[in-house]
Amino acid sequence: MTPPREEVVLLAEDGAPIGTADKATVHSESTPLHLAFSCHLFDGDGRILVTRRALGKATWPGVWTNSFCGHPALGESLEEAIARRAHEELGTSVDALALALALPDFRYRAVDATGVVEHEMCPVYTATIAWELRPSADEVAEWEWADPRALLSSVAATPWAFSPWLTLQLPALYAASGDQPSGQL
């Protein structure tokens, strides 16, 4: 059986939806602006979950990144998409009530080593979870709970080892937190 076609929501420059495109073909050298999300998970000790993208990923394979990210389907809320991707990517649950919208206006454009462009309007969420992780090997090569300040230092020292969206999001999350020493940035 053929898996269902996954589509992304295309956006105008002002963020208004203007259509959809097949996810398998939309990421190219001229990727249009589309809707996505990022989610940063924390444990009860205030550590942040970072994941290393599986080597089979089309863009930025093998780099360390945020806990998980994805694209909502047309008509799917960001919160519903986050719950879906938490299960698909990490084998865990994220309670919609535990989600906090941390960076509502985050947007970026980046080009990977193969020339493929990411061009996303990408609200950033955080959540604290207490559930076990069972990551999908198709999505995640490795994962680690990290001290937020140590991660921020690592990203600053070796940005090439991390996804471009993490290198942009993490300092913004840290700044928005009021420089909290632990817990959710």
Swiss-Prot record:
Cofactors (names): Mg(2+); Mn(2+)
Catalytic site positions: C69, E120
EC numbers for this chain: 5.3.3.2
Taxonomy, superkingdom: Bacteria
Catalytically driven reaction(s): isopentenyl diphosphate = dimethylallyl diphosphate
Binding site for Mn(2+): H27, H34, H71, E118, E120
Enzyme superclass (EC): isomerase
Hydrolase in keyword set: no
Pathway: Isoprenoid biosynthesis; dimethylallyl diphosphate biosynthesis; dimethylallyl diphosphate from isopentenyl diphosphate: step 1/1
Domain Nudix hydrolase stretches: 32-168
Cell compartments where the protein resides: Cytoplasm
Molecular function terms from GO: isopentenyl-diphosphate delta-isomerase activity; metal ion binding
Function comment: Catalyzes the 1,3-allylic rearrangement of the homoallylic substrate isopentenyl (IPP) to its highly electrophilic allylic isomer, dimethylallyl diphosphate (DMAPP).
Name this polypeptide is given: Isopentenyl-diphosphate Delta-isomerase
Biological source species: Leifsonia xyli subsp. xyli (strain CTCB07)
